[in-house]
């Protein structure tokens, strides 16, 4: 009889995509997978598209909520735990994998109540609040970066297989000349500061670069017109084939979410990171994983002006060898076996 895994992950691609990579790895080994999520977040559409059945509980975050919501929170959490417990009782999983998002909290508590082993994976350099709580009841805690939990095994972030299969950067870059291909990602929601600043710099860089700019939903206005005028770039709300985009690129300018940092390492690309300004400096610390190894440059959001970006870009554009060196250093920081290692731990811990 096939072993069963319940995956708890939701809210953002940074939680969902690594969890899908682990699910794929276990499916290859004959495991049955089911997902626990919430109806109003991205997993509701994304997970079924990958052929994985999903069950829903009702839960939302408490950050920024009013006093009324905080007073009701214990009842909402209790209700969500009971919903998750019912799903677990019916499904009878051999293990539960928590990959972050609000859904992991009630799901993890319910799994513990049902005597099902809980394995956690923290994607960021700073542990999320839900994972900090769940780490006290989990049988194993894994992490992408060495800074989230002091004694947890570092496995990296599971990324899509097609990224790890890209040719080594020194081979990809060997015959390239000009223009320098720059991939710009404002994130799925779009990062206004990146979307405003990069096109302004494009005006000054001329034919030395060609820019492929993912602006995020509803953010094409203004950006597209600038690239049409300069003739050295294109803009799109989304890029469907990220493996092809990474293969094409010589340099990436983007935020430094955990998954993005690990994808860039897997692809072997130099990066300019503009960390989102979390209170806990989460994205900044993610970015240091590559920046400290000489594979990336960090520009803080308040410093990300057209002139600062131009000053950083010009020496890189003038020296292809430097770009190749940074790309090789990025690839050296990759963890291509992360999904396999998480799957191994789940198999070890399954009841």
From Swiss-Prot:
Sequence positions that bind UDP-N-acetyl-alpha-D-glucosamine: 12-14, 124, 160, 188, 239, 258-263, 283
Catalytic activity: di-trans,octa-cis-undecaprenyl diphospho-N-acetyl-alpha-D-muramoyl-L-alanyl-D-glutamyl-meso-2,6-diaminopimeloyl-D-alanyl-D-alanine + UDP-N-acetyl-alpha-D-glucosamine = di-trans,octa-cis-undecaprenyl diphospho-[N-acetyl-alpha-D-glucosaminyl-(1->4)]-N-acetyl-alpha-D-muramoyl-L-alanyl-D-glutamyl-meso-2,6-diaminopimeloyl-D-alanyl-D-alanine + UDP + H(+)
Metabolic or biological pathway, per its Swiss-Prot or TrEMBL entry: Cell wall biogenesis; peptidoglycan biosynthesis
GO cellular component, one term: plasma membrane
InterPro entries: GlcNAc_MurG, Glyco_trans_28_C, GlycoTrans_28_N
Primary location class: membrane
First-level EC class: transferase
Gene3D superfamilies: Glycogen Phosphorylase B
BP terms from Gene Ontology: carbohydrate metabolic process; cell division; cell wall organization; lipid glycosylation; peptidoglycan biosynthetic process; regulation of cell shape
Molecular functions (GO terms): UDP-N-acetyl-D-glucosamine:N-acetylmuramoyl-L-alanyl-D-glutamyl-meso-2,6-diaminopimelyl-D-alanyl-D-alanine-diphosphoundecaprenol 4-beta-N-acetylglucosaminlytransferase activity; undecaprenyldiphospho-muramoylpentapeptide beta-N-acetylglucosaminyltransferase activity
Record has Zinc-finger as a keyword: no
Enzyme Commission code: 2.4.1.227
Disulfide links within the chain: none
Transmembrane segments: none
Pfam families with a match to the protein in the record: Glyco_tran_28_C, Glyco_transf_28
Keywords of this entry: Cell cycle, Cell division, Cell inner membrane, Cell membrane, Cell shape, Cell wall biogenesis/degradation, Glycosyltransferase, Membrane, Peptidoglycan synthesis, Transferase
Membrane topology note: Peripheral membrane protein
Subcellular location: Cell inner membrane
Family of this protein: Belongs to the glycosyltransferase 28 family. MurG subfamily.
PANTHER family tied to this protein: GLYCOSYLTRANSFERASE, UDP-N-ACETYLGLUCOSAMINE--N-ACETYLMURAMYL-(PENTAPEPTIDE) PYROPHOSPHORYL-UNDECAPRENOL N-ACETYLGLUCOSAMINE TRANSFERASE 1
Function: Cell wall formation. Catalyzes the transfer of a GlcNAc subunit on undecaprenyl-pyrophosphoryl-MurNAc-pentapeptide (lipid intermediate I) to form undecaprenyl-pyrophosphoryl-MurNAc-(pentapeptide)GlcNAc (lipid intermediate II).
Name of the protein: UDP-N-acetylglucosamine--N-acetylmuramyl-(pentapeptide) pyrophosphoryl-undecaprenol N-acetylglucosamine transferase
